[in-house]
Amino acid sequence: MVTHLEVCIDNIESLHYAIAGGATRIELCSSLALGGLTPSYGFMQQAAKQSSVPVYAMIRPRQGDFFYNEEELDMMRWDIEAAHQSGLDGVVLGVLTQEGDIHIPFATALCEFAQALGLGITFHRAFDQCRNAEQALEDIIHLGCERILTSGLAPSAPAGESVLKSLVEQAQGRIAIMAGAGVNADNARDLVKNTNVQEVHLSGKTTRPSQMTFIAGQSKMGASDVDDFAIPITSTQAIANVAAALK
């Protein structure tokens, strides 16, 4: 039985759409196109004010790998503090060594700091870049995290079903395994049935056109292939379809 349908969002508009679709928890990010980075303090504050379901903030200071230095560790501490001050329910984090193991000193520092503030912890898909998933699972359990977000080390959760099933069996209820990456209404039911995961994670993304009446075509705000006047948002229907498939 699925206990949580988590939706990742990167704007406040999507918060309302995700909850309307049946999200039971929100992962709050910026820049989902980069895999999700730390949201702003203002976004955390507004989400805490508006949400009727638990909200966990992504704690990821930059794009790229999950091997961080001391300065970045300090930044993550400040961001965890911001999540607490905003009234959020938890944080989502992950730190690795250069060799692809859980960075025990850094992970311990971050987890103990978050736990002392009363925040729940999800270990994110840095797990999927570990060299030894079985050992990483035990390390994360020892850290006291509530769950691991993982695709089963594969490009998508459906492709990682066999590993997801093994992780659930190894965990034996000591930690939740949350399947994420490529989850949709067409595969969610079979994914849960085949792996016994109790939590699933998705973005349910679509886009809407800009509401501006003047469209400037002479400049770009970022990459040339990104349409500045197409706003990525969560599709309420996409989330509702997954929720229905899981009933």
From Swiss-Prot:
Main location: cytoplasm
GO cellular component terms attached to this protein's record: cytoplasm
InterPro entries hit by this protein: CutC-like, CutC-like_dom_sf
One GO molecular-function entry: copper ion binding
Subcellular location: Cytoplasm
Coiled-coil parts of chain: none
Cytoplasm recorded as keyword: yes
Entry keywords, A to Z: Cytoplasm
Keyword Cytoplasm found: yes
Family: Belongs to the CutC family.
Protein's UniProt name: PF03932 family protein CutC
Naturally occurring in which organism (per UniProt): Vibrio parahaemolyticus serotype O3:K6 (strain RIMD 2210633)
Record lineage: Bacteria, Pseudomonadati, Pseudomonadota, Gammaproteobacteria, Vibrionales
